[in-house]
Amino acid sequence: MENNAPVPKLLLQLISSAFQRCRLAEDLCRLSVLLDQSTERDPPITCISIADTGIGCNLEEFQNLRCPREFNGAKIWDGLLSVKTTCFTDDEVYYYHINLDEYIANKRLKRQPSQAKNGAKFSGTEVSLSVFGSMDVLVAPIIGFFQKIIVLQILNVTLDLMVKQGTSPGNQTQYVFAVNADKTPCFTASNLERLKSGLEDYVLRHANCLDTMCDYCFSDREHLKVGSGTVCQEDKHKRVGGTMEVVIVISDLLESTQHCSRSCNGKTEVLYFDNFLPSPVPHLALSALKKIDWKKYGLILANVNDQDGHVFLEWDNFPSYVQIQIALHWYHNQYPTRQKNGPGISLLKKGIKNALDNLKAKHEGFLLSSHSRKICSYVPDLARSIAGLIFSSTDLDFQGDCLSVLGFQTQEVERDTVENYIQRKIVTVIGMNERKPQKDQEAAPFLFFDGESETSFFEDEEVEGEYYSSSLE
Amino acid sequence: MEESSGLSSMKFFSDQHLSYADILLPHEARARIEVSVLNLLRILNSPDPAISDLSLINRKRSNSCINKGILTDVSYIFLSTSFTKSSLTNAKTAKAFVRVWKVMEICFQILLQEKRVTQRELFYKLLCDSPDYFSSQIEVNRSVQDVVALLRCSRYSLGIMASSRGLVAGRLFLQEPGKEAVDCSACGSSGFAITGDLNLLDNTIMRTDARYIIIVEKHAIFHRLVEDRVFNHIPCVFITAKGYPDIATRFFLHRMSTTFPDLPILVLVDWNPAGLAILCTFKFGSIGMGLEAYRYACNVKWIGLRGDDLNLIPEESLVPLKPKDSQIAKSLLSSKILQENYIEELSLMVQTGKRAEIEALYCHGYNYLGKYIATKIVQGKYI
């Protein structure tokens, strides 16, 4: 199997190009991949076709494609791509043979006779090739790639994969990858909106392995907390600027999750997209993830597990029923561009931080630092005492004042309601204090006096033997 | 760091920055609690919400000042106007912050019922209700003092009684409202217990033909003197607080000193720094309860034991000072409140490294104590 490794890589490159052609077309497009393994030959040969109805291809994209004919001493393919392509305005369908094994540019490409379109208006490309060996090793990477691509929710592209073994229809399988229909953003939604919706789906559908939301884990989308952050880099000195978008989804799974086949073990998968394509997580992004001050969000990063760009973050002291999912998307502001510069580390960090802060702002008492969480643990008791003070009073004026200050209309309001309100309010303030930059954290007002006198910090411990102690009987 | 001692030339105004706890009626104390609740809620629910910090009068040495009386002979320690901040969002003070509100909640209920509880009762109540916050009596007491420092009303005003350890015996008649007068010379050797109810103490009628008030540090010595009816020979009233005096005993003594201003108050303590510290608590008040203790400072005099009594005591009865003694001595010496001859005594203790207990005088017989006091009084040897 291993000796086939260059082939999946080549296929993903070809599929990526096809996907970009579809994405850039304004129309509804289809990207079909066909894997056809003949059963009569030994060793088997698999014919592969990657066809799209996107804008025609400009051949430049094949310039840098490389794939050896042999790998580990075994022949893996003949090195030949056949490409048929036409643009909307073209009168014919052009046909080329491209020999990827040839390094001399003008020998690499051989034009074949074109076909007339006879006035028909369409565009599209089909790339085909044949490889030795079974197609088994090819199916999984393609499916995995498609499952990730649909996180971006590029709505005008439908993806499908047809797997054929022999001529019998019983040996055909078709996989269709479509965006989940129950909550689909409209065509005009921003990239970020779509990424948010896509990542939610990705979580709900177990990394898009399911066609619908997993009922074991989720009863509805409300179990998801979503935060997003965007940072833009301006165009500068001929350098094309770009946008870094980060979405973080945290799911509070149900208790019944344990019945579900998929267990996340509390690990966090990081998805990385480079210019609308799934891509291995680059090293700079890894460093950025490591440098985030997770403790500020009550998280302790235990380990970063990197398997060739497939990255999982592992946490310490993390509840197993909570799952965090992170998606990073970097794209240039102009596309296509020949430049391939990625985001800098500070841009990455800022994006992730913005997403975390956004999540924290939207969900009170969530992602608080361990300090604030400790403080919050005292809040129910404090709220109970304050509500106790209000409701034990026999002074109706005082009670009325308290309730009206809190915005309650009637005297009939229940103690529990008031207690919960006070509790929520205090937790909100604790969360707000945390989001304020340190320098902006003004001292809280005093209960009675406006702190104009010299103040010092409260020391909890009475100093032993200081002067003579008072009797505290 | 140099402490502000209040020893300025403007002695008349040295206590203008005095912070104090008011003595309030239950409904007045309740009103202060209500105001604090309303203030908290207002700020919490304002457009720019916050959790109000508690500003407590600082009960540290650094915030203590000394008033050296010019027109009176009473000096006292008081707390000035520096604050400490107790904040929910500060990890160091968060729990103390919640404790303050818990104590206020209970005090509010006590005040509503117009009842009084002891700090011990309060402790058990809090231990049942909120075991996560109160694990010791000390924590309860400290939180009570925090509430006093926040609301600036006395502990008694909050409905909390000092469970008094004080005893009184001798030539004194005490008549509580609506009751018969008690003859403190006829209460046996255990004396008459001073109540922790300050209000009752305030309304008790006092009569005496004594010439002296004598405070005794130790219960055993008090017991000996009363059993021997020393007050028959020396016309006096004996008081003990069994160690450091509680507020009720100080209140009682202060009430006596204002009712009978001509009676000198003499103090008999062990010859060690702790003995002197006990004397000073009667004389100047204390920092821990500085918001109210200053009121009850009395101009007490030190009758014994003192350095020149050492010749009455066998060498083997002198024991070495303990580290704790040295600590207290150091603290007292740096307090700047001691008069010259007190400093000399304290320096002598430190110099010799020894301490002596009153019981050492028993080597001259059990009845020697009465004679010792009589001699001291006759010779006017109290400072």
Curated annotation (Swiss-Prot), chain A:
Supply the InterPro entries for this chain. MTOPVIB_plant
List the Gene Ontology MF annotations in alphabetical order. Answer: DNA topoisomerase type II (double strand cut, ATP-hydrolyzing) activity; protein-macromolecule adaptor activity
What are the protein's UniProt keywords?
Chromosome, Cytoplasm, Meiosis, Nucleus
Any one cellular-component term (Gene Ontology): cytoplasm
Q: What GO terms in the biological process aspect are recorded for it?
A: embryo sac morphogenesis; meiotic DNA double-strand break formation; pollen sperm cell differentiation; protein-containing complex assembly; reciprocal meiotic recombination
Q: What is its main location?
A: nucleus
Effect of a null allele: Defective in meiosis. Sterility due to male and female gamete developmental defects leading to disturbed embryo sac development and abnormal pollen formation. Strong reduction in bivalent formation at metaphase I caused by defects in meiotic double-strand breaks (DSB) formation. Impaired homologous chromosome synapsis and recombination.
Q: Which residues cross the membrane?
A: none
Tissue specificity note: Expressed ubiquitously in different tissues, including roots, stems, leaves, seedlings, inflorescences, siliques and pollen grains, specially as a higher level in inflorescence.
Reading the lineage from the top rank, the first entry is Eukaryota
Annotated compartments: Chromosome; Nucleus; Cytoplasm
The record's function comment reads:
Component of a topoisomerase 6 complex specifically required for meiotic recombination. Together with SPO11 (SPO11-1 and SPO11-2), mediates DNA cleavage that forms the double-strand breaks (DSB) that initiate meiotic recombination. The complex promotes relaxation of negative and positive supercoiled DNA and DNA decatenation through cleavage and ligation cycles.
The record's domain comment reads: Despite a weak sequence similarity, retains most of the structural features of the ancestral archaeal Top6B subunit (AC O05207), including the transducer domain that interacts with the SPO11 subunit and the ATP-binding fold, also named GHKL fold.
Q: How does it assemble?
A: Heterotetramer of 2 SPO11 (SPO11-1 and/or SPO11-2) and 2 MTOPVIB chains. Interacts with SPO11-1 and SPO11-2. Binds to PRD1.
Q: Which family does it belong to?
A: Belongs to the TOP6B-like family.
Q: What is this protein called?
A: Type 2 DNA topoisomerase 6 subunit B-like
Q: Gene name on record? A: MTOPVIB
Swiss-Prot record, chain B:
Active-site residues are: 124
Q: Which UniProt keywords apply?
A: DNA-binding, Isomerase, Magnesium, Meiosis, Metal-binding, Nucleus, Topoisomerase
Catalytic activity, reaction form: ATP-dependent breakage, passage and rejoining of double-stranded DNA
Principal location class: nucleus
Class in the EC hierarchy, top level: isomerase
**In the UniProt record for this chain, what is stated about the effect of gene disruption?**
Plants show a semi-sterile phenotype and a drastic decrease of meiotic recombination, indicating that SPO11-1 and SPO11-3 are not functionally redundant. SPO11-1 and SPO11-2 are both required for double-strand breaks induction. Drastic decrease in chiasma formation at metaphase I associated with an absence of synapsis in prophase, due to the inability to make double-strand breaks (DSB).
Q: Where in this chain does the record put each Topo IIA-type catalytic domain?
A: 24-167
InterPro entries reported for this sequence: Spo11/TopoVI_A, Spo11/TopoVI_A_N, Spo11/TopoVI_A_sf, TOPRIM_Topo6A/Spo11, WH-like_DNA-bd_sf
One GO cellular component this record assigns the protein to is:
nucleus
EC identifiers of the protein:
5.6.2.2
Identify the cofactor(s).
Answer: Mg(2+)
List residues binding Mg(2+).
Answer: 217, 270
Query: Which GO molecular function entries does the Swiss-Prot or TrEMBL record give?
Result: ATP binding; DNA binding; DNA topoisomerase type II (double strand cut, ATP-hydrolyzing) activity; metal ion binding
Pfam families tied to this protein: TOP6A-Spo11_Toprim, TP6A_N
Task: Give a brief account of the tissues where this protein occurs.
Answer: Very low expression in flowers and shoots.
Q: Localized where?
A: Nucleus
Q: Where does the signal peptide begin and end?
A: none
GO biological process: one example:
embryo sac development
What does the function comment of this entry state?
A: Component of a topoisomerase 6 complex specifically required for meiotic recombination. Together with MTOPVIB, mediates DNA cleavage that forms the double-strand breaks (DSB) that initiate meiotic recombination. The complex promotes relaxation of negative and positive supercoiled DNA and DNA decatenation through cleavage and ligation cycles.
Name the family.
Belongs to the TOP6A family.
Assembly state and interactors? Heterotetramer of 2 SPO11 (SPO11-1 and/or SPO11-2) and 2 MTOPVIB chains. Interacts with MTOPVIB. May form a heterodimer with SPO11-1. Interacts with PRD1. Does not interact with TOP6B.
Descriptive protein name: Meiotic recombination protein SPO11-2
Question: What's the source species for this entry?
Answer: Arabidopsis thaliana
Q: Which gene encodes it?
A: SPO11-2
